[in-house]
Protein backbone atom coordinates (compact mmCIF):
# COMPACT_ATOMS: atom_id res chain seq x y z
CA UNK A 1 0.00 0.00 0.00
CA UNK A 2 1.22 3.48 -0.81
CA UNK A 3 2.23 5.46 2.24
CA UNK A 4 0.49 8.80 2.14
CA UNK A 5 2.64 11.25 4.06
CA UNK A 6 5.52 10.77 6.39
CA UNK A 7 4.14 8.99 9.44
CA UNK A 8 4.86 12.07 11.48
CA UNK A 9 2.54 14.14 9.34
CA UNK A 10 -0.10 11.48 9.22
CA UNK A 11 -0.21 10.75 12.94
CA UNK A 12 0.44 14.22 14.26
CA UNK A 13 -0.48 13.80 17.92
CA UNK A 14 1.65 11.65 20.20
CA UNK A 15 -0.35 9.70 22.78
CA UNK A 16 1.22 7.33 25.27
CA UNK A 17 -0.44 4.52 27.12
CA UNK A 18 0.34 1.23 28.78
CA UNK A 19 1.57 -0.77 25.77
CA UNK A 20 0.75 -4.25 27.07
CA UNK A 21 -2.90 -3.94 26.02
CA UNK A 22 -1.79 -3.84 22.39
CA UNK A 23 -3.47 -5.59 19.49
CA UNK A 24 -1.03 -6.47 16.73
CA UNK A 25 -0.94 -3.75 14.11
CA UNK A 26 -3.30 -1.57 16.11
CA UNK A 27 -1.14 -0.55 19.05
CA UNK A 28 0.50 2.71 20.08
CA UNK A 29 3.85 1.85 18.54
CA UNK A 30 2.62 1.01 15.05
CA UNK A 31 -0.16 3.57 14.69
CA UNK A 32 0.77 6.52 16.87
CA UNK A 33 -2.61 6.31 18.60
CA UNK A 34 -3.58 4.72 21.90
CA UNK A 35 -6.49 2.28 22.28
CA UNK A 36 -8.85 5.00 23.49
CA UNK A 37 -8.36 7.00 20.29
CA UNK A 38 -10.71 4.50 18.68
CA UNK A 39 -10.82 4.45 14.91
CA UNK A 40 -7.80 6.74 14.58
CA UNK A 41 -5.73 3.54 14.91
CA UNK A 42 -7.37 2.27 11.73
CA UNK A 43 -6.61 5.24 9.46
CA UNK A 44 -4.41 3.12 7.19
CA UNK A 45 -6.25 -0.19 7.72
CA UNK A 46 -9.16 0.06 5.30
CA UNK A 47 -10.44 -3.44 6.09
CA UNK A 48 -10.54 -2.85 9.85
CA UNK A 49 -12.06 0.61 9.38
CA UNK A 50 -14.77 -1.01 7.26
CA UNK A 51 -15.46 -3.36 10.18
CA UNK A 52 -15.79 -0.43 12.59
CA UNK A 53 -18.22 1.37 10.30
CA UNK A 54 -20.37 -1.70 9.61
CA UNK A 55 -20.49 -2.53 13.33
CA UNK A 56 -21.48 1.07 14.07
CA UNK A 57 -24.29 0.82 11.52
CA UNK A 58 -25.35 -2.40 13.24
CA UNK A 59 -25.58 -0.62 16.61
CA UNK A 60 -27.65 2.18 15.08
CA UNK A 61 -30.07 -0.23 13.38
CA UNK A 62 -30.25 -2.38 16.54
CA UNK A 63 -31.29 0.68 18.55
CA UNK A 64 -33.95 1.50 15.94
CA UNK A 65 -35.37 -2.03 15.99
CA UNK A 66 -35.22 -2.54 19.76
CA UNK A 67 -36.66 0.89 20.55
CA UNK A 68 -39.34 0.34 17.91
CA UNK A 69 -40.45 -2.92 19.57
CA UNK A 70 -40.25 -1.29 23.02
CA UNK A 71 -42.63 1.45 21.86
CA UNK A 72 -44.99 -1.12 20.30
CA UNK A 73 -45.01 -3.14 23.53
CA UNK A 74 -45.87 -0.07 25.61
CA UNK A 75 -48.28 1.54 23.17
CA UNK A 76 -51.84 2.22 24.36
CA UNK A 77 -54.09 2.84 21.32
CA UNK A 78 -56.59 4.88 23.35
CA UNK A 79 -54.05 7.61 24.16
CA UNK A 80 -52.39 9.93 21.66
CA UNK A 81 -48.81 8.99 20.75
CA UNK A 82 -47.41 12.25 22.09
CA UNK A 83 -48.77 11.49 25.56
CA UNK A 84 -46.80 8.23 25.66
CA UNK A 85 -43.30 9.55 25.07
CA UNK A 86 -43.04 7.88 21.66
CA UNK A 87 -40.57 9.15 19.06
CA UNK A 88 -40.38 6.27 16.55
CA UNK A 89 -44.03 5.28 16.11
CA UNK A 90 -44.95 8.89 15.16
CA UNK A 91 -42.46 8.65 12.28
CA UNK A 92 -44.01 5.38 11.08
CA UNK A 93 -47.52 6.81 11.44
CA UNK A 94 -46.52 9.92 9.47
CA UNK A 95 -45.47 7.59 6.64
CA UNK A 96 -49.04 6.30 6.57
CA UNK A 97 -48.56 2.95 8.28
CA UNK A 98 -51.19 1.68 10.68
CA UNK A 99 -53.29 4.85 10.88
CA UNK A 100 -56.65 6.00 9.53
CA UNK A 101 -58.79 9.15 9.58
CA UNK A 102 -57.83 11.70 12.23
CA UNK A 103 -54.56 9.92 12.87
CA UNK A 104 -56.27 7.12 14.80
CA UNK A 105 -54.13 3.98 15.03
CA UNK A 106 -56.07 1.09 13.49
CA UNK A 107 -53.29 -1.52 13.20
CA UNK A 108 -50.03 -1.86 15.15
CA UNK A 109 -48.77 -4.83 13.12
CA UNK A 110 -46.79 -2.68 10.62
CA UNK A 111 -44.93 -1.17 13.58
CA UNK A 112 -44.05 -4.65 14.84
CA UNK A 113 -42.83 -5.63 11.36
CA UNK A 114 -40.65 -2.51 11.20
CA UNK A 115 -39.02 -3.36 14.54
CA UNK A 116 -38.35 -6.98 13.58
CA UNK A 117 -36.91 -6.02 10.17
CA UNK A 118 -34.52 -3.59 11.85
CA UNK A 119 -33.47 -6.19 14.43
CA UNK A 120 -32.75 -8.78 11.73
CA UNK A 121 -30.84 -6.21 9.67
CA UNK A 122 -28.79 -5.25 12.72
CA UNK A 123 -27.77 -8.89 13.22
CA UNK A 124 -26.49 -9.05 9.64
CA UNK A 125 -24.61 -5.76 10.07
CA UNK A 126 -23.27 -6.86 13.45
CA UNK A 127 -21.91 -10.09 11.97
CA UNK A 128 -20.33 -8.16 9.09
CA UNK A 129 -18.80 -5.68 11.51
CA UNK A 130 -17.27 -8.38 13.70
CA UNK A 131 -16.06 -10.28 10.64
CA UNK A 132 -14.28 -7.29 9.12
CA UNK A 133 -12.95 -6.07 12.47
CA UNK A 134 -11.48 -9.44 13.54
CA UNK A 135 -11.27 -11.91 10.63
CA UNK A 136 -11.31 -10.05 7.33
CA UNK A 137 -8.24 -8.59 5.57
CA UNK A 138 -6.60 -5.66 7.36
CA UNK A 139 -6.44 -3.70 4.12
CA UNK A 140 -8.68 -3.96 1.07
CA UNK A 141 -6.34 -2.42 -1.50
CA UNK A 142 -4.66 -5.70 -2.49
CA UNK A 143 -7.59 -8.14 -2.63
CA UNK A 144 -10.49 -5.80 -3.41
CA UNK A 145 -9.06 -2.73 -5.15
CA UNK A 146 -12.53 -1.34 -5.88
CA UNK A 147 -13.15 -1.04 -2.13
CA UNK A 148 -9.61 0.06 -1.30
CA UNK A 149 -8.53 3.68 -1.14
CA UNK A 150 -5.74 6.04 -0.21
CA UNK A 151 -6.92 9.11 1.65
CA UNK A 152 -5.02 11.58 -0.51
CA UNK A 153 -6.20 9.99 -3.79
CA UNK A 154 -8.51 12.83 -4.74
CA UNK A 155 -10.14 11.01 -7.66
CA UNK A 156 -11.02 7.98 -5.52
CA UNK A 157 -12.38 10.20 -2.75
CA UNK A 158 -14.77 12.01 -5.10
CA UNK A 159 -15.86 8.63 -6.51
CA UNK A 160 -16.75 7.52 -2.97
CA UNK A 161 -18.54 10.86 -2.47
CA UNK A 162 -20.51 10.20 -5.66
CA UNK A 163 -21.58 6.73 -4.50
CA UNK A 164 -22.79 8.21 -1.21
CA UNK A 165 -24.76 10.93 -3.03
CA UNK A 166 -26.48 8.35 -5.24
CA UNK A 167 -27.50 6.33 -2.16
CA UNK A 168 -28.88 9.48 -0.50
CA UNK A 169 -30.81 10.30 -3.68
CA UNK A 170 -32.32 6.80 -3.76
CA UNK A 171 -33.33 7.29 -0.12
CA UNK A 172 -35.17 10.50 -1.03
CA UNK A 173 -36.98 8.63 -3.82
CA UNK A 174 -38.08 5.91 -1.37
CA UNK A 175 -40.27 8.55 0.31
CA UNK A 176 -41.54 9.70 -3.09
CA UNK A 177 -42.51 6.15 -4.09
CA UNK A 178 -44.20 5.55 -0.72
CA UNK A 179 -46.26 8.71 -1.16
CA UNK A 180 -47.13 8.09 -4.83
CA UNK A 181 -47.55 4.32 -5.17
CA UNK A 182 -47.33 2.43 -1.87
CA UNK A 183 -50.35 3.50 0.15
CA UNK A 184 -49.57 7.20 0.46
CA UNK A 185 -48.57 9.17 3.55
CA UNK A 186 -50.46 10.85 6.39
CA UNK A 187 -51.74 14.30 5.47
CA UNK A 188 -52.73 16.38 8.48
CA UNK A 189 -54.49 18.82 6.08
CA UNK A 190 -56.91 16.25 4.65
CA UNK A 191 -60.52 17.47 5.07
CA UNK A 192 -62.22 16.66 8.36
CA UNK A 193 -59.07 16.32 10.45
CA UNK A 194 -56.34 14.42 8.61
CA UNK A 195 -56.08 11.09 6.76
CA UNK A 196 -53.71 8.87 4.79
CA UNK A 197 -53.74 9.69 1.08
CA UNK A 198 -51.69 9.14 -2.04
CA UNK A 199 -50.02 12.27 -3.37
CA UNK A 200 -51.14 12.75 -6.96
CA UNK A 201 -50.33 16.33 -7.93
CA UNK A 202 -46.63 16.81 -7.14
CA UNK A 203 -45.17 20.31 -6.95
CA UNK A 204 -42.25 20.24 -9.37
CA UNK A 205 -42.09 23.96 -10.20
CA UNK A 206 -38.52 25.08 -9.47
CA UNK A 207 -39.72 28.57 -8.55
CA UNK A 208 -41.83 27.12 -5.72
CA UNK A 209 -39.36 24.47 -4.54
CA UNK A 210 -36.29 26.70 -4.63
CA UNK A 211 -38.36 29.66 -3.47
CA UNK A 212 -38.35 28.04 -0.03
CA UNK A 213 -34.54 28.22 0.01
CA UNK A 214 -34.64 31.93 -0.82
CA UNK A 215 -37.17 32.83 1.90
CA UNK A 216 -36.10 34.66 5.04
CA UNK A 217 -35.73 32.37 8.09
CA UNK A 218 -37.52 34.91 10.32
CA UNK A 219 -41.11 35.63 11.28
CA UNK A 220 -43.84 34.45 8.96
CA UNK A 221 -41.30 33.49 6.29
CA UNK A 222 -39.60 30.54 7.97
CA UNK A 223 -37.27 29.38 5.14
CA UNK A 224 -37.80 25.68 4.20
CA UNK A 225 -39.31 25.01 7.63
CA UNK A 226 -42.43 26.90 6.53
CA UNK A 227 -43.48 24.20 4.03
CA UNK A 228 -47.12 23.40 4.74
CA UNK A 229 -48.41 21.04 2.09
CA UNK A 230 -47.38 17.51 1.20
CA UNK A 231 -47.27 18.16 -2.54
CA UNK A 232 -44.39 20.56 -1.90
CA UNK A 233 -42.64 18.15 0.50
CA UNK A 234 -42.80 15.18 -1.88
CA UNK A 235 -41.98 17.35 -4.89
CA UNK A 236 -38.99 18.68 -2.97
CA UNK A 237 -37.82 15.10 -2.47
CA UNK A 238 -38.07 14.49 -6.22
CA UNK A 239 -35.79 17.49 -6.77
CA UNK A 240 -33.43 16.54 -3.95
CA UNK A 241 -33.23 12.92 -5.05
CA UNK A 242 -32.56 13.92 -8.65
CA UNK A 243 -29.89 16.45 -7.69
CA UNK A 244 -28.16 13.92 -5.40
CA UNK A 245 -28.18 11.18 -8.05
CA UNK A 246 -26.99 13.48 -10.86
CA UNK A 247 -24.37 15.00 -8.56
CA UNK A 248 -23.25 11.52 -7.59
CA UNK A 249 -22.82 10.48 -11.22
CA UNK A 250 -20.92 13.73 -11.86
CA UNK A 251 -18.53 13.10 -8.96
CA UNK A 252 -17.92 9.49 -10.06
CA UNK A 253 -17.13 10.48 -13.65
CA UNK A 254 -15.02 13.59 -13.00
CA UNK A 255 -11.82 14.45 -11.16
CA UNK A 256 -11.66 17.44 -8.78
CA UNK A 257 -10.87 20.73 -10.52
CA UNK A 258 -7.65 22.56 -9.71
CA UNK A 259 -9.36 25.11 -7.47
CA UNK A 260 -10.88 22.30 -5.38
CA UNK A 261 -7.55 20.48 -5.15
CA UNK A 262 -5.97 23.68 -3.84
CA UNK A 263 -8.78 24.84 -1.57
CA UNK A 264 -9.54 21.62 0.32
CA UNK A 265 -7.44 19.54 2.68
CA UNK A 266 -7.26 15.95 1.39
CA UNK A 267 -6.84 13.68 4.43
CA UNK A 268 -8.99 11.29 6.42
CA UNK A 269 -9.36 13.75 9.29
CA UNK A 270 -10.36 16.53 6.89
CA UNK A 271 -13.13 14.35 5.44
CA UNK A 272 -14.27 13.58 8.97
CA UNK A 273 -14.49 17.31 9.72
CA UNK A 274 -16.49 17.99 6.54
CA UNK A 275 -18.93 15.21 7.45
CA UNK A 276 -19.34 16.48 11.01
CA UNK A 277 -20.11 19.98 9.69
CA UNK A 278 -22.78 18.59 7.36
CA UNK A 279 -24.41 16.50 10.10
CA UNK A 280 -24.33 19.53 12.40
CA UNK A 281 -26.29 21.57 9.85
CA UNK A 282 -28.77 18.68 9.46
CA UNK A 283 -29.22 18.59 13.24
CA UNK A 284 -29.99 22.31 13.49
CA UNK A 285 -32.46 22.14 10.57
CA UNK A 286 -34.16 19.05 12.05
CA UNK A 287 -34.47 20.89 15.37
CA UNK A 288 -36.35 23.78 13.74
CA UNK A 289 -38.46 21.45 11.60
CA UNK A 290 -39.77 19.31 14.45
CA UNK A 291 -40.35 22.35 16.66
CA UNK A 292 -42.26 24.54 14.19
CA UNK A 293 -43.59 22.37 11.37
CA UNK A 294 -46.91 20.57 11.83
CA UNK A 295 -47.13 19.19 8.27
CA UNK A 296 -43.97 17.08 8.08
CA UNK A 297 -44.47 16.39 11.81
CA UNK A 298 -48.27 16.16 12.25
CA UNK A 299 -49.59 17.34 15.61
CA UNK A 300 -51.81 14.24 15.81
CA UNK A 301 -48.65 12.21 16.49
CA UNK A 302 -46.08 14.68 17.84
CA UNK A 303 -48.40 16.93 19.81
CA UNK A 304 -49.04 20.60 19.02
CA UNK A 305 -46.26 23.06 18.29
CA UNK A 306 -45.72 25.84 20.84
CA UNK A 307 -47.55 28.46 18.76
CA UNK A 308 -50.30 25.92 18.03
CA UNK A 309 -50.95 25.20 21.73
CA UNK A 310 -51.05 28.93 22.46
CA UNK A 311 -53.49 29.69 19.64
CA UNK A 312 -55.56 26.67 20.70
CA UNK A 313 -55.95 28.15 24.17
CA UNK A 314 -57.16 31.48 22.77
CA UNK A 315 -59.59 29.63 20.51
CA UNK A 316 -60.90 27.43 23.35
CA UNK A 317 -61.75 30.42 25.55
CA UNK A 318 -63.23 32.33 22.62
CA UNK A 319 -65.60 29.39 22.09
CA UNK A 320 -66.46 29.20 25.80
CA UNK A 321 -67.09 32.90 26.32
CA UNK A 322 -69.01 33.26 23.06
CA UNK A 323 -71.38 30.57 24.34
CA UNK A 324 -71.73 32.55 27.56
CA UNK A 325 -72.83 35.59 25.59
CA UNK A 326 -69.63 37.57 25.02
CA UNK A 327 -69.38 39.58 21.83
CA UNK A 328 -65.96 38.30 20.78
CA UNK A 329 -65.66 40.83 17.96
CA UNK A 330 -65.72 43.88 20.21
CA UNK A 331 -64.76 42.76 23.74
CA UNK A 332 -61.83 44.78 25.06
CA UNK A 333 -58.94 43.22 26.96
CA UNK A 334 -57.02 44.71 29.93
CA UNK A 335 -54.53 46.48 27.64
CA UNK A 336 -57.15 48.20 25.52
CA UNK A 337 -56.55 45.80 22.64
CA UNK A 338 -59.16 43.23 21.66
CA UNK A 339 -59.65 40.51 24.28
CA UNK A 340 -60.42 37.71 21.81
CA UNK A 341 -59.69 39.23 18.40
CA UNK A 342 -57.53 42.09 17.17
CA UNK A 343 -55.80 43.22 14.02
CA UNK A 344 -52.20 42.41 13.12
CA UNK A 345 -50.00 45.30 11.92
CA UNK A 346 -50.81 44.29 8.34
CA UNK A 347 -54.56 44.26 8.91
CA UNK A 348 -55.46 40.58 9.34
CA UNK A 349 -57.89 39.64 12.08
CA UNK A 350 -55.94 37.54 14.61
CA UNK A 351 -56.42 36.15 18.11
CA UNK A 352 -55.92 38.77 20.83
CA UNK A 353 -54.04 38.52 24.07
CA UNK A 354 -50.59 37.08 24.59
CA UNK A 355 -50.97 34.67 21.67
CA UNK A 356 -50.88 37.63 19.24
CA UNK A 357 -47.17 36.91 18.78
CA UNK A 358 -48.09 33.58 17.17
CA UNK A 359 -50.55 35.16 14.72
CA UNK A 360 -48.92 33.50 11.69
CA UNK A 361 -49.57 29.96 12.92
CA UNK A 362 -51.28 27.75 10.35
CA UNK A 363 -53.01 24.61 11.62
CA UNK A 364 -55.60 22.30 10.03
CA UNK A 365 -58.14 22.81 12.82
CA UNK A 366 -58.01 26.61 12.47
CA UNK A 367 -57.68 27.33 8.74
CA UNK A 368 -61.37 26.61 7.88
CA UNK A 369 -62.29 29.64 10.03
CA UNK A 370 -60.13 32.07 8.06
CA UNK A 371 -61.37 34.37 5.33
CA UNK A 372 -59.47 36.64 2.95
CA UNK A 373 -58.53 39.03 5.80
CA UNK A 374 -57.57 36.63 8.56
CA UNK A 375 -60.07 35.08 10.99
CA UNK A 376 -63.62 35.51 9.70
CA UNK A 377 -65.99 36.81 12.39
CA UNK A 378 -69.11 35.31 10.83
CA UNK A 379 -67.45 31.88 10.62
CA UNK A 380 -66.34 32.14 14.23
CA UNK A 381 -69.97 32.84 15.17
CA UNK A 382 -71.65 30.18 13.00
CA UNK A 383 -69.23 27.60 11.61
CA UNK A 384 -67.11 26.22 14.47
CA UNK A 385 -67.31 22.40 14.35
CA UNK A 386 -67.18 20.10 17.41
CA UNK A 387 -63.99 18.40 16.16
CA UNK A 388 -62.25 21.79 16.08
CA UNK A 389 -63.28 22.50 19.68
CA UNK A 390 -62.16 19.06 20.84
CA UNK A 391 -58.82 19.27 19.10
CA UNK A 392 -58.00 22.78 20.31
CA UNK A 393 -58.92 21.88 23.91
CA UNK A 394 -56.64 18.83 23.65
CA UNK A 395 -53.76 20.86 22.20
CA UNK A 396 -54.22 23.66 24.74
CA UNK A 397 -53.41 21.23 27.55
CA UNK A 398 -50.47 19.63 25.75
CA UNK A 399 -48.16 22.54 25.03
CA UNK A 400 -44.59 21.40 24.26
CA UNK A 401 -43.23 23.13 27.35
CA UNK A 402 -41.95 21.70 30.58
CA UNK A 403 -38.82 19.86 31.57
CA UNK A 404 -38.20 16.31 32.75
CA UNK A 405 -40.76 15.17 35.33
CA UNK A 406 -42.59 18.45 35.01
CA UNK A 407 -46.18 19.20 34.22
CA UNK A 408 -46.23 19.62 30.47
CA UNK A 409 -47.98 22.66 29.17
CA UNK A 410 -48.28 26.06 30.79
CA UNK A 411 -47.30 25.82 34.46
CA UNK A 412 -50.36 27.79 35.60
CA UNK A 413 -52.81 25.74 33.51
CA UNK A 414 -54.87 23.55 35.86
CA UNK A 415 -55.90 21.19 33.07
CA UNK A 416 -52.38 20.43 31.84
CA UNK A 417 -51.15 16.84 32.01
CA UNK A 418 -47.87 15.46 33.24
CA UNK A 419 -45.93 14.78 30.08
CA UNK A 420 -43.00 16.00 28.02
CA UNK A 421 -43.79 16.53 24.36
CA UNK A 422 -41.87 14.51 21.74
CA UNK A 423 -41.33 17.87 20.04
CA UNK A 424 -39.41 19.00 23.14
CA UNK A 425 -37.37 15.78 23.16
CA UNK A 426 -36.59 15.79 19.45
CA UNK A 427 -35.91 19.51 19.07
CA UNK A 428 -33.69 19.68 22.16
CA UNK A 429 -31.74 16.52 21.36
CA UNK A 430 -31.10 17.56 17.77
CA UNK A 431 -30.03 21.05 18.81
CA UNK A 432 -27.60 19.68 21.40
CA UNK A 433 -26.25 17.01 19.04
CA UNK A 434 -25.99 19.57 16.24
CA UNK A 435 -23.92 21.78 18.54
CA UNK A 436 -21.66 18.93 19.67
CA UNK A 437 -21.09 17.85 16.07
CA UNK A 438 -20.21 21.45 15.20
CA UNK A 439 -17.60 21.52 17.97
CA UNK A 440 -16.29 18.19 16.64
CA UNK A 441 -16.07 19.77 13.19
CA UNK A 442 -14.01 22.68 14.55
CA UNK A 443 -11.71 20.29 16.43
CA UNK A 444 -11.02 17.92 13.55
CA UNK A 445 -10.86 20.71 10.96
CA UNK A 446 -8.24 22.47 13.07
CA UNK A 447 -6.19 19.30 13.45
CA UNK A 448 -6.49 18.43 9.76
CA UNK A 449 -5.40 21.90 8.65
CA UNK A 450 -2.51 21.91 11.11
CA UNK A 451 -1.36 18.46 9.98
CA UNK A 452 -1.54 19.56 6.34
CA UNK A 453 0.53 22.65 7.18
CA UNK A 454 3.03 20.39 8.94
CA UNK A 455 3.19 22.06 12.34
CA UNK A 456 0.94 19.90 14.53
CA UNK A 457 3.09 18.03 17.01
CA UNK A 458 0.70 17.37 19.87
CA UNK A 459 1.32 17.87 23.57
CA UNK A 460 4.84 17.29 24.82
CA UNK A 461 4.36 14.31 27.11
CA UNK A 462 7.97 13.82 28.26
CA UNK A 463 7.30 15.26 31.71
CA UNK A 464 3.76 14.07 32.27
CA UNK A 465 3.19 12.98 35.91
CA UNK A 466 1.53 9.74 34.80
CA UNK A 467 4.82 8.52 33.28
CA UNK A 468 6.38 8.21 36.74
CA UNK A 469 3.46 6.25 38.19
CA UNK A 470 3.17 2.47 38.52
CA UNK A 471 1.58 0.80 35.46
CA UNK A 472 -2.04 -0.19 36.02
CA UNK A 473 -1.34 -3.89 35.55
From Swiss-Prot:
Functional description taken from the UniProt entry: One of the components of the core complex of photosystem II (PSII). It binds chlorophyll and helps catalyze the primary light-induced photochemical processes of PSII. PSII is a light-driven water:plastoquinone oxidoreductase, using light energy to abstract electrons from H(2)O, generating O(2) and a proton gradient subsequently used for ATP formation.
Gene Ontology cellular component annotations, sorted alphabetically: chloroplast thylakoid membrane; photosystem II
Family according to the record: Belongs to the PsbB/PsbC family. PsbC subfamily.
Cofactor note: Binds multiple chlorophylls and provides some of the ligands for the Ca-4Mn-5O cluster of the oxygen-evolving complex. It may also provide a ligand for a Cl- that is required for oxygen evolution. PSII binds additional chlorophylls, carotenoids and specific lipids.
Subcellular location: Plastid, Chloroplast thylakoid membrane
The gene coding this protein: psbC
Protein's recorded name: Photosystem II CP43 reaction center protein
Keywords assigned by UniProt, alphabetized: Acetylation, Chlorophyll, Chloroplast, Chromophore, Manganese, Membrane, Metal-binding, Phosphoprotein, Photosynthesis, Photosystem II, Plastid, Thylakoid, Transmembrane, Transmembrane helix
Binding site for [CaMn4O5] cluster: 367
Assembly behavior: PSII is composed of 1 copy each of membrane proteins PsbA, PsbB, PsbC, PsbD, PsbE, PsbF, PsbH, PsbI, PsbJ, PsbK, PsbL, PsbM, PsbT, PsbX, PsbY, PsbZ, Psb30/Ycf12, at least 3 peripheral proteins of the oxygen-evolving complex and a large number of cofactors. It forms dimeric complexes.
Propeptide: 1-14
InterPro entries from the UniProt entry: PS_antenna-like, PS_II_antenna-like_sf, PSII_PsbC, PSII_PsbC_sf
Residues recorded with modification Phosphothreonine: 15
N-acetylthreonine sites (modified residues): 15
Any Gene Ontology biological process: photosynthetic electron transport in photosystem II
Amino acid sequence: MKTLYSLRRFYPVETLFNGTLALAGRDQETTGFAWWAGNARLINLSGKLLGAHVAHAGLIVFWAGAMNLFEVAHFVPEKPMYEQGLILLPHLATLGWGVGPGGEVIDTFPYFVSGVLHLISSAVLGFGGIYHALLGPETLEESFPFFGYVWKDRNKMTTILGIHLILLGLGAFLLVFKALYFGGVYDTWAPGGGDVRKITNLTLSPSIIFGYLLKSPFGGEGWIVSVDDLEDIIGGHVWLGSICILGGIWHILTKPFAWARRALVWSGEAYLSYSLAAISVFGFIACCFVWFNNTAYPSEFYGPTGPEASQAQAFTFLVRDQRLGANVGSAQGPTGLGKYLMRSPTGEVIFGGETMRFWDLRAPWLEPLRGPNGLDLSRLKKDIQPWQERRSAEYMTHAPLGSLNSVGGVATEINAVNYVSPRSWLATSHFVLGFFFFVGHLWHAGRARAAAAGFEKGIDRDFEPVLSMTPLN
